[in-house]
Amino acid sequence: MNKILLLVILSSIVFGCSRQKVVEATYENGKPRIIKYYHKKGGEFVLDREVVYYKNEQKKIDGEYKDQLRSGLWKAWYENGNLWSEGEYKDGKRNGKGISYHENGKKYIEGMYRNDIRVGVWRFYDTTGVLTSEVNFDLVPGSLERDSLQ
């Protein structure tokens, strides 16, 4: 039991020392606007997560990095705390399902991305969540529309 406890303590010390939280920007009141997290790899610190906040301290954007590029699930929120958008990234580009929501929490848009480009059928909803239209971006000439969480 003591060996397990010692292992847990040592692991937490090593992990705690290898990940660094850096407040990169603040608001006038001193509260964080952008926090980035870095881990130690090969003697240097590498970006692995970014969190952006509104002035009211509500989370605005949160996502992971791999090899300095956006990777995995990224989420964005309205200032009121409701989810605004979520989507998957791979190698810094949107890939997979993307969903955006109205500020009231109802679904607004959903569809698929491939290398930052909208592909396949996209569905659009009104503020009550009722489907209003569908667009097949594979059939729309010149539809190389690029989107990204900003």
Regions found by a protein language model. Give the residues of each.
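Periodic aromatic/glycine/histidine/acidic cluster detector
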Residues: 17-78, 82-90, 94-101, 106-114, ...
